[in-house]
A protein has these predicted regions:
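Extended, low-complexity, turn-rich repeat/linker tracts enriched in Gly/Pro/Ser/Thr and Asp/Glu
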Residues: 157, 171-173, 184-195, 252-254
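Short beta-strands within extracellular/lumenal beta-sheet-rich domains
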Residues: 149-178, 228-230, 261
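Exposed beta-strand face motif in extracellular beta-rich ectodomains
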Residues: 47-49, 177, 240-244
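OB-fold and OB-like single-stranded nucleic-acid-recognition modules
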Residues: 1-76
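Terminal, low-complexity interaction segments
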Residues: 202, 207-272
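Extracellular carbohydrate-recognition regions
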Residues: 74-126
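Extra-cytoplasmic beta-strand recognition segments
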Residues: 13-15, 85, 164-188
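Short, surface-exposed beta-strand/strand-loop-strand elements in extracellular ectodomains
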Residues: 193-204
Length: 272
C-alpha cells in the first residue's frame, strides 16, 4: 500500500466522496481519480468499498488510483435500530400529504394521524401497533401529523413527542454507539422559526438520563431543512426494557413549538 512501484492494485476502505480511508492507523489515504460515472461511486459515500485499478502515484499524504472496478460492501456501520417510516406510504398517498421541509412550503398539507385510515386502520394506530407510543398534552392526540412518510409534532398551543419501541441488542460499554435522527423546526408566516427545544430521555427503572438536543439557532426566514441530531450512548444502557422518549421541553404552553422528525437510527461505525 505504501509502495511507489505498484501497478494494478486493489484497495478496501471507507469512501467519503473522493478518497478511501483504509484504517485509522494508515499513513496514507487513497484518492480515486478519473473514475467513470458508470462505476456509481457518487452514491457510495459512507460505504465500505473495494476499488481495483491502476496506481497513479503519490501526492503526500494521498495515494492515487485510477479505478476500473468498484465493489460495494455496504454502509460503514452496524445498525441496531432503524426507522424511516417509509412504510407509511399507503397513508401518505391516501391523504395526499405534502413535504413541508423538502419544499420549504408552509402550506404543504399535513393531516392528523388519527384522521387517515387505510384498510380500517388509522395511521396513528398503525404506528403504535409497532410498539411506539405517542405522548401529547391536553389529552389531544390529534396534534401529531403525517407528512410524506415522516411525522410532524404539535400546533400552536399543543405539543407532542414519541416513545420508541423496545430495542434489544445494543452493546453496553461502547464509546461509539449513537442514537441519531433528522429533525426540523417549523417557520411561522412572519418568518420566525418556532423555538423548539428537543430532548431525548433514557429511562431504566428509576434511572433517568436526559440529553438536550442543540437548538437550531436559525435567523428569521431561514429555509426549512433537515438537521441531523446525534446522541452518544456512552454510559447509557439501552435494552428491551429501556424507555426512550424524543420530545420537547415546551409542554402545556400556548406558544407555537412545532417540529418534524424522520430517520431514527441507533448505530456504530465499523472499525477497519
Amino acid at each position: 500500500y505504501t509502495s511507489s512501484k505498484l501497478g494494478y492494485v486493489t484497495v478496501k476502505g471507507v469512501f467519503n466522496g473522493s478518497t478511501l480511508t483504509v484504517s485509522e492507523d494508515a499513513k496514507y489515504s487513497v484518492s480515486v481519480v478519473d473514475a467513470p460515472s458508470s462505476l456509481g461511486l457518487s452514491a457510495l459515500t459512507g460505504h465500505i468499498v473495494t476499488v481495483t485499478g491502476y496506481y497513479a502515484g503519490l501526492a503526500e499524504p494521498v495515494q492515487r488510483i485510477m479505478a476500473t472496478d468498484v465493489e460495494d460492501n455496504g454502509l460503514n456501520e452496524i445498525v441496531y435500530f432503524l426507522e424511516n417510516f417509509e412504510w407509511l406510504e399507503p397513508w401518505s398517498v391516501a391523504s395526499g400529504v405534502g413535504q413541508t421541509v423538502e419544499t420549504d412550503n408552509l402550506d404543504a398539507k399535513a393531516t392528523a394521524l388519527t384522521s387517515i385510515t387505510v384498510d380500517g386502520v388509522t395511521a396513528f394506530d398503525a404506528v403504535e401497533k409497532l410498539g411506539y407510543k405517542f405522548i401529547y398534552d391536553k389529552n389531544d392526540n390529534k396534534r401529531i401529523y403525517l407528512q410524506q412518510n415522516y411525522l410532524k409534532f404539535g400546533k400552536t398551543g399543543n405539543h407532542a413527542g414519541i416513545i420508541l419501541p423496545p430495542i434489544d441488542g445494543v452493546p453496553e460499554a461502547k464509546d461509539n454507539v449513537t442514537l441519531s435522527f433528522d429533525w426540523c423546526g417549523m417557520r411561522q408566516g412572519s418568518g420566525k422559526i418556532d423555538p423548539v427545544n428537543l430532548i431525548v430521555i433514557f429511562e431504566n427503572g428509576s434511572d433517568k438520563v436526559q440529553i438536550d438536543i442543540p437548538e437550531l439557532g436559525w435567523e428569521d426566514g431561514h429555509k426549512l431543512e433537515w438537521v441531523r441530531a446525534e446522541v452518544s450512548l456512552k454510559g447509557i444502557t439501552v435494552n428491551k426494557d429501556t424507555k426512550i422518549t424524543i420530545t420537547q421541553t415546551q409542554w402545556e404552553v400556548g406558544t407555537a413549538n412545532r417540529w418534524f422528525r424522520d430517520n431514527i437510527k441507533i448505530s456504530e461505525p465499523i472499525k477497519l
